């Protein structure tokens, strides 16, 4: 993304710790992902029980739901993590099924494009060393960003087809 942002954030790298919960065990069944935008968290759930919580960075203008392409907002609603990209420009990424039919209908009524290409992803390639410091500022175009190590954990724990709910 923006090289200057990541260079500045690298300074705070050693001052920011990761979440305390343990890594979800291989074979644990994550059946839902919950993102709380206000808290800047992503939770992995199994049968309603929180298995792991990650701190995240969101779109650069995160307050309110995504309504149009280029608004730098992270969508709000219930979607599906429907496919993954192991060769993403952001380390690894898992696609969020935004826009839904409802999102498209609202955008159509307004005569605008709802946008798309919203993912849960790691850090931009070449900036993995920034680590947890990336969370000091919301910086994505509307995606949900975690560290590369956290993305590896999510990648292993969350199967394609898992529901993701994104709340304000």
What do these predicted ranges mean?
Residues 22-31, 38, 58-83, 102-106, ...:
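N-terminal post-signal-peptidase region of extra-cytosolic proteins
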Residues 32, 53-55, 78, 117, ...:
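Well-ordered beta-strand positions in beta-sheet-rich domains
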Residues 28-52:
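N-terminal targeting signals for Sec/Tat export/insertion, comprising classic cleavable signal peptides
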Residues 25-28, 83-168:
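Exported/periplasmic cell-wall-interacting domains
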Residues 7-15:
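Bacterial N-terminal signal peptides
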Residues 38, 45-47, 56, 84, ...:
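Surface loops and adjacent helix of pleckstrin homology
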Residues 49-61:
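Short Gly/aromatic-enriched secondary-structure transition segments
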Residues 1-6:
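Bacterial N-terminal signal peptides that target proteins for export
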